[in-house]
Amino acid sequence: KTMMRQILGEDYREVLPLDEVDGEDVDNYIRAWETAHSLLAEGDNKKLLAVGKGQWTLPLPIVRGDTGWYFDIPEGLERMRIRRIGRNELATIQAILAYYDAQMEYAEQDRNDDGLLEYARQVVSTPGTHDGLYWDVAEGEPESPLGPLMGDRTPGGGYHGYYYRILEGQGEDARGGAYSYLIGYRMRAGFAAVAWPIDYGESGVMSFTVSHDGVVYESNLGEDTATIAADMTLYNPGAGWSPVQEVNGPQADSR
């Protein structure tokens, strides 16, 4: 701790909370350092420490000041925030695609022995049933459609900094127009979901949505993201929503 304070300053815990550091991450960093390490210049007065063959850079820049070189903690915190948002948003895109795949798989079988194929109206099944996309399985049993993905849930119900909700209908801006996905109390006419950041600007910025069409849309809902998402009951990617090109490709524009 004394060494950390000498190197990073009194606020070292903000960038290196020792009680939260994963031992495996430390080992990976040491191996990368032993493979290769260098300083990458960003102008004349700033350098970044890079390690490994891929030159992963420590988010804490080393800058030149009046008394010499030092780690710039404020800029480092901002770089860490940007990286965290990027990681969470990429994870959310993959998670919402996994939701799409899970719903398609779920509807391939009659999950409640009523002779009908349907989509799941909830993510986690009621104990002892298969009415959701995830359920506990015993050793040797097939995984549920969402499988081990649910193992990374946070205690508050989020996943990689995002909340999720299943939507049971769509609005006028969706392909096919407005209609409910419910036939009776079963969701058989389609499915959709929306994901939004738990802490806007910190855990994420963009919100994401997908339906049975398989096109992932994104939108920056702004500072009122939590309120807007709480009021969202329909899949309706209208003004302000655009396809995620990295996932969907140009063909999504015509859907």
What spans do the regions from the language model cover?
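Stable alpha-helical elements in mature extracytoplasmic
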Residues: M4, D22-D25, L58, T92-A95, ...
